[in-house]
């Protein structure tokens, strides 16, 4: 089951740690959608036909024309620490984007309408859709490895 929570307001230290509020404030996928517009699905990766249909539907409904595989691994990624720091910088892009985790684990942080950060723990089979113009950031977990499929609108969307 997906884990989503409101982050502490001023996280310090390693971004790859959970950074829960105390006590933790869990959030449901429905609340995530209402607060940030971000959509979440857990895909059945064992049923290849259903998976292909779901991804085809996603690409058609959201006009995703490009996709790639992105791997971030402490053992093979050059300048891993610099890359983690770069990816954890807040960013906002003028187009929606989707990410599906195919190996490893990661955190996606999305800013809600009140300026609070919501953290999504993403693992194998998780698919998230981040709306256009939504502030977000990304990092691995302490396992330091994630492999994902990234879906884009067109060539200029990376």
UniProtKB/Swiss-Prot annotation:
Q: What is its main location?
A: cytoplasm
Q: Where does the source fall among the domains of life?
A: Eukaryota
Question: Where is this protein localized, as stated in its record?
Answer: Cytoplasm; Nucleus
GO molecular function terms here?
Answer: acireductone dioxygenase [iron(II)-requiring] activity
PANTHER family referenced in this protein's UniProt entry, alphabetically: ACIREDUCTONE DIOXYGENASE, INACTIVE ACIREDUCTONE DIOXYGENASE 2-RELATED
Q: Which family does it belong to?
A: Belongs to the acireductone dioxygenase (ARD) family.
Would you tell me the protein name for this molecule?
A: Probable inactive acireductone dioxygenase 2
Organism of this sequence: Caenorhabditis elegans
